[in-house]
Amino acid sequence: MKKKNNKGFTLIELLVVVAIIGILAAVGVVAYSGYTDNARKGAAKSNHATVLKYIAGEVQKCSLGDTDAMKNKAGTAQLTCSERKTADKVAIAAAAALDSFKNPYGSVGTPASSLAVFKDTALTTCDATNEGRTNVQNTTTTITLTTCIKSGEAVLTLSLIHI
């Protein structure tokens, strides 16, 4: 009698392996989605904190006697210290100097923009049109930063008093 040589996998074994791979893929997609969502939120919070430190440091330079502040990538000053208490001057300069900050949520808003820092009125609500966006606004006495961390969450707000 001749012996049968069975090499390979049966159809049932292959179906079980495919089912296991499908389950692992489904779990992985959900976990990855949560990971990227948390990373975006963390980046938006980091942008807010960095903008705050940057503006506070630049305004402090003015208080210590410098004449110019908030230089852009080319080294051009975006703010003359004598104008720092003029409404919107700090906000305009900060938005221009920090134009390399990118929105972790990509292009949002109308018109769509991938920038993260804007000279604009304070955010009051956080929705899909302003996720990841940090608005800078200043009066003659106060600089206000507002950031939408994630749609549906509270707006992160902080005000600085001019020195």
Segment roles from a protein language model:
Residues A91-L158:
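Low-complexity, acidic interaction segments enriched in glycine
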Residues M1-A49:
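Amphipathic alpha-helical segments typified by the pilin-like N-terminal helix
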Residues N5, N72, I149-K150:
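Acidic surface patches and DE-rich sequence motifs
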Residues K53-Q78:
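Alpha-helix exit/C-cap motif
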Residues I161-I163:
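Conserved small/polar residues in nucleotide/adenosyl-binding loops
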Residues K85:
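Basic, alpha-helical nucleic-acid-binding regions used in initiation and control of genome expression
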Residues I21-A25, V90-A95:
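Alpha-helical interaction segments
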